[in-house]
Amino acid sequence: MSNNSSKSFCLLGFPLILILLLSFLLFSSFPNNESPPQQFFSSLTMSSLLVHTNALQSSSSSSSLYSPPITVKRRSNLEKREEELRKARAAIRRAVRFKNCTSNEEVITYIPTGQIYRNSFAFHQSHIEMMKTFKVWSYKEGEQPLVHDGPVNDIYGIEGQFIDELSYVMGGPSGRFRASRPEEAHAFFLPFSVANIVHYVYQPITSPADFNRARLHRIFNDYVDVVAHKHPFWNQSNGADHFMVSCHDWAPDVPDSKPEFFKNFMRGLCNANTSEGFRRNIDFSIPEINIPKRKLKPPFMGQNPENRTILAFFAGRAHGYIREVLFSHWKGKDKDVQVYDHLTKGQNYHELIGHSKFCLCPSGYEVASPREVEAIYSGCVPVVISDNYSLPFNDVLDWSKFSVEIPVDKIPDIKKILQEIPHDKYLRMYRNVMKVRRHFVVNRPAQPFDVIHMILHSVWLRRLNIRLPS
């Protein structure tokens, strides 16, 4: 009898001890004897655990076997977008850590390498993730010419080119960035043109009173009010995932009437002056490009380094105090540093740039100037002379490797500064200028790593730095 009892105890006791041991191990793995949090398990595992527990505890009760199914909450569109961005951030971190990029072959058209990039691995992987993931919704509200249209030539041309590309061309077969519906978008584009507003609403300007920005503020505020009331997206982020792009001098003033309301709003500006409210962590600088009519870029007339006989060159009007200082020291005074307020008959602007080693890029009335891009197009090393100018694409491009920055108070020393640059360093800078050109070229339709994609990448980087609450 005792032997049978011992056997019975062993048969029953061993499973009981095993269950107690497993229970102890499971619950002791969580601090303070708390039950494991439900989010620790996937929804599938949690449902399975609950069903089996009910069956074991109340096998005689039919109601426990047919308890209402557990509903799994579907992720919202915003949660899906945030998860996509989280994966992109993780991929970029891995690329930086392991100095290696992962990509689908279809998006490999160019591999960023070399000194011109602050971190080539981060930039390459970021561009890959942008090509795979990034979706932008261009609002449909509003009518031309103030919205969905803009100048496509001259110094404001990049404004209209970008609006046209994002609103129309990118909706075709190559439109990988254009969201098919707003719920898919990671960022939202306000496609109004400051240049067109000034042209159609303000012209002709006949008195100082005509420069008042009140009408510009009213048009912009009304447009944002319309999209904010019609769609949930502005209020969802307080405007942090919304952006505009403009090269007009008045563009920085757009949100001035409601600074608190627009404090998170991203502005892509040519006039990226940090002393006039440009915020590097929110706004982004875009290049001012003088786009010729019926063309996308000027003719290339650049010479090899050995054929560049002019040390430094500038030609332009005396707009602003910086150029006045430049003219007072160098206009018509030196054969090596050639500075003109106008060119005489027979002189070709692009040919002179093509024969120059360094191209002077002084700010005009505003900090931005098309001179930097003109220099880059021609293989001439830009010499940036400005105060408080945040250079285009400075997040990813290291301008010190392909340009020279000279403070305004050093203008009298321009020749000395440039002559002291060793020849081998100049040659490296020249090669870097030739390499960085692709990032300032306008293509239609846009191509990977060109200027339109670089503008989008500036938006993408800032969107990656925003985590919206779900």
UniProtKB/Swiss-Prot annotation:
Residues with attached carbohydrate: 100, 235, 273, 307, 388
UniProt topology in membrane: Single-pass type II membrane protein
Pfam families referenced in this protein's UniProt entry, alphabetically: Exostosin_GT47
Similarity comment: Belongs to the glycosyltransferase 47 family.
Record GO biological process: cell wall organization; protein glycosylation
Protein's organism: Arabidopsis thaliana
EC number(s) on file: 2.4.-.-
Lumenal topology ranges: 29-470
Gene Ontology CC entries for this record: Golgi membrane
Disruption phenotype: No visible phenotype.
An MF annotation (GO) of this entry: glycosyltransferase activity
Residues that span the membrane, as ranges: 8-28
Chain ranges on the Cytoplasmic side, renumbered to this chain: 1-7
Subcellular location(s) per record: Golgi apparatus membrane
Function: May be involved in cell wall biosynthesis.
Superkingdom of this protein's organism: Eukaryota
Annotated protein name in UniProt: Probable glycosyltransferase At3g42180
Keyword entries, A-Z: Cell wall biogenesis/degradation, Glycoprotein, Glycosyltransferase, Golgi apparatus, Membrane, Signal-anchor, Transferase, Transmembrane, Transmembrane helix
